[in-house]
Amino acid sequence: MWIERNLIASILLFSTSAYAAFKPRIVKKEFDDLLNPIYFNDSSTVLGLVDQTLLISNDDGKSWTNLQEVITPGEIDPLTIVNIEFNPSASKAFVFTASKHYLTLDKGSTWKEFQIPLEKYGNRIAYDVEFNFVNEEHAIIRTRSCKRRFDCKDEYFYSLDDLQSVDKITISDEIVNCQFSQSSTSSDSRKNDAITCVTRKLDSNRHFLESNVLTTLNFFKDVTSLPASDPLTKMLIKDIRVVQNYIVLFVSSDRYNKYSPTLLFISKDGNTFKEASLPDSEGTSPSVHFLKSPNPNLIRAIRLGKKNSLDGGGFYSEVLQSDSTGLHFHVLLDHLEANLLSYYQIENLANLEGIWIANQIDTSSKFGSKSVITFDAGLTWSPVTVDEDEDKSLHIIAFAGENSLYESKFPVSTPGIALRIGLIGDSSDALDIGSYRTFLTRDAGLTWSQVFDNVSVCGFGNYGNIILCCSYDPLLRSEPLKFRYSLDQGLNWESIDLGFNGVAVGVLNNIDNSSPQFLVMTIATDGKSSKAQHFLYSVDFSDAYEKKICDVTKDELFEEWTGRIDPVTKLPICVNGHKEKFRRRKADAECFSGELFQDLTPIEEPCDCDPDIDYECSLGFEFDAESNRCEPNLSILSSHYCVGKNLKRKVKVDRKSKVAGTKCKKDVKLKDNSFTLDCSKTSEPDLSEQRIVSTTISFEGSPVQYIYLKQGTNTTLLDETVILRTSLRTVYVSHNGGTTFDRVSIEDDVSFIDIYTNHYFPDNVYLITDTDELYVSDNRAISFQKVDMPSRAGLELGVRALTFHKSDPNKFIWFGEKDCNSIFDRSCQTQAYITEDNGLSFKPLLENVRSCYFVGTTFDSKLYDFDPNLIFCEQRVPNQRFLKLVASKDYFYDDKEELYPKIIGIATTMSFVIVATINEDNRSLKAFITADGSTFAEQLFPADLDFGREVAYTVIDNWESKTPNFFFHLTTSEDKDLEFGALLKSNYNGTTYTLAANNVNRNDRGYVDYEIVLNLNGIALINTVINSKELESEQSLETAKKLKTQITYNDGSEWVYLKPPTIDSEKNKFSCVKDKLSLEKCSLNLKGATDRPDSRDSISSGSAVGLLFGVGNVGEYLNQDSSGLALYFSKDAGISWKEIAKGDYMWEFGDQGTILVIVEFKKKVDTLKYSLDEGETWFDYKFANEKTYVLDLATVPSDTSRKFIILANRGEEGDHETVVHTIDFSKVHQRQCLLNLQDSNAGDDFEYWSPKNPSAVDGCMLGHEESYLKRIASHSDCFIGNAPLSEKYKVIKNCACTRRDYECDYNFALANDGTCKLVEGESPLDYSEVCRRDPTSIEYFLPTGYRKVGLSTCEGGLELDNWNPVPCPGKTREFNRKYGTGATGYKIVVIVAVPLLVLLSATWFLYEKGIKRNGGFARFGVIRLGEDDDDDLQMIEENNTDKVVNVVVKGLIHAFRAVFVSYLFFRKRAAKMFGGSSFSHRHILPQDEDAQAFLASDLESESGELFRYASDDDDAREIDSVIEGGIDVEDDDEENINFDSR
């Protein structure tokens, strides 16, 4: 503070003759809007843009002229300026308007119109000009014409004469970018006029086909391109940049995902490109930008990553630098701060070589970052301090503009002098703008001093000797405006009061800061009105120092200032082999330094070569920190040196070599620099496992919960985010698939007790705490915001914490505690609150609830009318163990309706809500369904099911399937560990059900062994209890369930056992297969979803079509002894299986099935197995140096990543240390698979595969033949990535209907002979409801006992469901018109009699020739399931006539069977059908993703638990309830792992 007080005192007392006698001349100009001035270089001429009107001043802004009066005098229509371009030296300007374009080649003195032959695509047009650094007359013009956002067309042009004439570049219609190869001053290895362009070809659907790099040396008269064999032509080249001596291509690592990580390909000649090696990144952003480098052979780049924080802040980045080949990068500065707009917090201070100042993320700092500075081009970094006081750190807030990052033609103009805005120490508040200060340095950042106690905008004149500043409020709050200026490099200051309130927004000098003239842009307000005035001040210091010019020969007026000083040793620092000095005016000299518009030239002095700085690792060597030397990479060395004659020789190679381009002198003879490469021993096979990368991270505490975020709405953020919670209630986040984790840090010591994700908006993450605070992220856990909740979460009361709105991410319901001193307090209850602004405010919704649902977003608005604000709540009934269902359309403000007084819960499935109600006997259940929230229909179950009372329901929501029906499990056996029941299938609206399978297994929590095969409709697996009768007997208390696996290929219409493989993984034949036992005694039986540790582990994958895994055994039923289990694999959707390995394994799919990974479960292991060719061959890979106890194997939910994580404990299960192994296969494949979406015969890496029903004789399944695109298994050298394979899915044809396209209708049951027969004593449904549902219908069909499988698309053939049409009420006329009824007279003879005579004749002939001689009618049977062919019907065929007759007879027999069945089932009167509607709910530990269960037990039993309820899990929704005394609360230590996927 002493220094600061004395500085203020000096400002007040300082009075020299120069200050006393001098005041700058000020000219004030007012404009209608803010003026944006731009100087020509070395000139007093300024262009000014005001609201798209261009002005010009030739006297440093003192007077202005409308440029239109200069260019086009007399024209009425104003020129609307689109943009202005300057050449690199800022001596020429090019003005683009909406209609015409103008240029000046003499700094605005004269103007000339020029034309661009643009094919106008839209009304919004942008122009961008790039000039050749060597010859600025040569230019490339890029135009973009847009109709609307993202609907644009780019065109490229070139000019050889300063745009006076412009020609279009016509080498391709799809140019990505073109650049001069001499786009910087240091591009010395290419010809001056070389132009390099990138082109990209897309198909009609805008999918990538190919890229190319085109080069011309004579302005497109001759063009060279990459050969078709070059791998780059098959990669998505996103852009091109010329960086110093290099041409850099930005290449997407996945050609079908432009947001995938960016690869850099480098070339010096523009013809040969090599991929650069970048260090592994913690982030996945594709953004890469370049910095200026002191050596043109060294590339400096910034790579954007991600930041995890609670401040809502942005991203972090890394500063990278290459070696002098441009191919190998290392990190100079990590965790560089950046914001969401990629504005990097780094700058080249005062344009001095090697001096950079940056903000680096520092979580220990109150600001979240710290300012650091380097004086040796990034080799070392040190804190920025004030007045050389290390305890007074300076935190820079505002950095110079983006231009400081890139190549500039302008040299240093203010040597060592800079002003920045910042804060001192951690005591200041970064959010308080009033605490910001203005700081000055005169030694290029070595020391800083405060000059103003507020924010100021400043400009430099006369090379930094004159400084003009104005106070600036970032909030643009008006205050008395004054100028403050210094004539001695900021040591002393004077002020001028301008006499009005306002704010300055910018101070400008000419480009090289040599002029004494300044322009100040201000906004003024009078305090009485909101209207602002815009003033431009021209401030002239030409009369300062009594107009004296410094005598350059007088040393007392100048000093030699060294540009880079070591902050510790205070000695000059060498960068790029040289030191740098400037001759600058001393601060107290009273004269103008140098001549106007004269550039400063540094004085360079070469340094002696330094072995650590001026030498680098040679090609094929990498620096190793442990040995402190360059160690060889044998694969790189051998590929480069072991060629030709050297294949069997020993080659000597230098470990280090001199950095190309360094200016140092006196080469150093390096010790131990030679390495001998024995080429005869380096030829090793390039095995894939050598390219797998594994990392291991450990945390304190056991893993309790982990979640992979599903692909979100923001596609720029890749699907690699993992969130992990431990038993210590800490949360860690990884954005790179588990390679690195960051702990979610918060200010207070808060414990996280649960993690929720929004199923509808996967980017949203919610961290539940043990307090009344909630942490919310809407950007995939990149940052979190703290939200104060109205109460603590009610998780301990057995309720969920949150439910979400389907269409509004800001709307959710919070379930908290009310009046809870403890959970045993009798007054303790739950209270629901609703927010519509993402937690900023809450309103009470309803008290004493178990859960509430936004059901108004569930129903189908196209079919039904309902209130979108409709909410259903399950509300507790005092002193009762059941709930009641209440509804409201206004959040229970005025509207509240009780729908059902006694329920156990509700659930949603598809667009329905299902309610499980309790009957009057208090012992059984009844289910109702609604599709609009107001009309409910009872769900009718098959009448022939003997299940006694209904005790438990599970709704299986096939949300991954396209089936119009859903499955419903009704428990028929509820004894503990002996649970099973009937699997029922609904009709289209969920009101009636038929039996799909009996005795289907279920666990004690209501989850069912039913699992669909993802992405293949109609295929599902179940486990049935084959000893159900034995279990139902009273003598079976010690008997366990015997499970047998079955599979369906027609959505549950028929089920078959899994065919076992012949041999096991050890090539031994299975005994039951050897004995040729039937499938009933010898089939493959697999553990179901209820028996997996993580039910999110599906048997199949949505992206790896047809590939299935399962753990089980071959035999009569599933072996409960784990020692007899093995892992099985199918690549044809379950038709055939292969044993992979013996033991209990976990599995995962990667890259849409090209990578298969398995690891043994619940065992300490260090090795996994993987396959790259769909399971044909398997390899072992050791992923860790020590064995860990495996808990789970996981990857992204879409199974498209090439990264996997193994979650483990260091010791046995329950050990309090989490270990995460990450296994990365990204470098295993050498290329991306080729896919031509337009030409399937283009010879790419894919083939079509068609799923089949093994019971069918043709290729039809569900009424059609379909094909999916899959990578050819043997093409294991390529990966798929985000290739849109689903777009090539095709239906080859629809098939004729067969028996397998039908299932039994309601009240009909499958008989032993394969036919559907009416249940005794029941009546069929009344199908006339279709007339009421669809007013356009003119007919309906009487029930036949059959209904078509909902997923079947078959046409014609066997029509078992519509034999007898009946007209709809009031549609008789239309019905008669359709079927031609009502004819009389002659028409009857023609229409009826003649065909009847023909039929009788044909019938007699067929009877004699076909039926009678083949044994009569006794040989022909009825319709049976599974008898599509007639192979068992051998008929006499002696000639061609016999063959024709027999074919006709067989057809007639089939037809007669259909008629006979209709006769059987049309005798009963049709019953009426109930109307339609829906249901939703909840999760616990991740269970069957498709299950929602209603559980009930005897209300009068002493066990006291009617149903159980736990916290939410979006994958397994269970509808039940918590009765007093029936609550299970998770232990505080949370030892049990909860692989939740909310």
From Swiss-Prot:
Belongs to the VPS10-related sortilin family. It is a multi-pass membrane protein. Residues 1409-1445 are cytoplasmic. Residues 1-20 form the signal peptide. The keyword RNA-binding does not apply. It holds the Pfam family Sortilin_C. Gene3D superfamilies: 2.10.70.80, 3.30.60.270, YVTN repeat-like/Quinoprotein amine dehydrogenase. Residues 21-1387, 1467-1542 are lumenal. Keywords: Glycoprotein, Golgi apparatus, Membrane, Protein transport, Receptor, Repeat, Signal, Transmembrane, Transmembrane helix, Transport. Glycans are attached at residues 41, 454, 633, 714, 922, 989. It comes from the Eukaryota. The gene is VPS10. SMART domains: VPS10 (SM00602). The lineage of its organism: Eukaryota, Fungi, Dikarya, Ascomycota, Saccharomycotina. Functions as a sorting receptor in the Golgi compartment required for the intracellular sorting and delivery of soluble vacuolar proteins, like carboxypeptidase Y (CPY) and proteinase A. Executes multiple rounds of sorting by cycling between the late Golgi and a prevacuolar endosome-like compartment. The chain crosses the membrane at residues 1388-1408, 1446-1466. This is Vacuolar protein sorting/targeting protein 10. GO terms for cellular component: cytosol; Golgi apparatus; membrane. SUPFAM superfamilies: Oligoxyloglucan reducing end-specific cellobiohydrolase, Sialidases.
